[in-house]
Amino acid sequence: MGQKAPDFTVNTSKGPVTLSSYRGKWVLLFSHPGDFTPVCTTEFIAFTERYKDFQALGVELLGLSIDSVYSHIAWIRDIKEHFGIEIPFPIIADIDKEVARQYNLIDEKSGATVRGVFIIDPNQIVRWMIYYPAETGRNIDEIIRVIKALQFNWERKLATPANWQPGQEGIEGAPSTVDASLKRDGEPGVKTWYLKFVK
């Protein structure tokens, strides 16, 4: 985290994709253990149902597993047939596990990809990553909240407190000298010298 996202050129369910071609945009890269699995299916439906919300935030979605592109195509068709949902974003066919290894997404026991999430900023820096247990589906609301918090930081250079929601106050960085800390005394939003809330 905080490092440049490893670049890649891969085959996907929508044709070849190069990560660096997304420079200037936010990217949500997420891996799943396998096509035609119950938890993953609910996640892809959930991501699709919130796709417009991601688009409104300027976020491009990229799914990934080590299944073949033909498996992805068949799964996408199956989801459309049984749930009436058309997956709008590319799914990477990482059959040689190259991208999964670059991003440390391989489960050593099963050999499959783990349930990982990476948020990559417009400068192609990894800003957030999280791994979910294989048996636990992702919380899309929380992923969107984190994206909004990171974009708030990007625009305002402010951190966000626990349980922050859009529209709430941010936190200014702590002073790095005694003099700077003394200057804060009595300023609006100051709770103590190292904690200052800013609207």
UniProtKB/Swiss-Prot annotation:
Organism domain of life: Archaea
Organism of this sequence: Thermoplasma acidophilum (strain ATCC 25905 / DSM 1728 / JCM 9062 / NBRC 15155 / AMRC-C165)
GO cellular component assignments: cytosol
Span of domain Thioredoxin: 1-152
Note: The active site is a conserved redox-active cysteine residue, the peroxidatic cysteine (C(P)), which makes the nucleophilic attack on the peroxide substrate. The peroxide oxidizes the C(P)-SH to cysteine sulfenic acid (C(P)-SOH), which then reacts with another cysteine residue, the resolving cysteine (C(R)), to form a disulfide bridge. The disulfide is subsequently reduced by an appropriate electron donor to complete the catalytic cycle. In this 1-Cys peroxiredoxin, no C(R) is present and C(P) instead forms a disulfide with a cysteine from another protein or with a small thiol molecule.
MF-aspect GO terms: thioredoxin peroxidase activity
Gene Ontology terms: biological process: cell redox homeostasis; cellular response to stress; hydrogen peroxide catabolic process; response to oxidative stress
Keywords linked to the UniProt accession: Antioxidant, Cytoplasm, Oxidoreductase, Peroxidase, Redox-active center
Active site, UniProt feature: 40 (cysteine sulfenic acid (-soh) intermediate)
Family the UniProt entry places it in: Belongs to the peroxiredoxin family. Prx6 subfamily.
Protein role: Thiol-specific peroxidase that catalyzes the reduction of hydrogen peroxide and organic hydroperoxides to water and alcohols, respectively. Plays a role in cell protection against oxidative stress by detoxifying peroxides.
Stated name of the protein: Peroxiredoxin 2
Record flagged with keyword Nucleotidyltransferase: no
SUPFAM superfamilies, per database record: Thioredoxin-like
Complexes and interactors: Homodecamer. Pentamer of dimers that assemble into a ring structure.
Gene3D superfamilies per the UniProt record, alphabetical: Glutaredoxin (3.40.30.10)
Enzyme class: oxidoreductase
EC number: 1.11.1.24
Catalytic activity: a hydroperoxide + [thioredoxin]-dithiol = an alcohol + [thioredoxin]-disulfide + H2O
Subcellular location: Cytoplasm
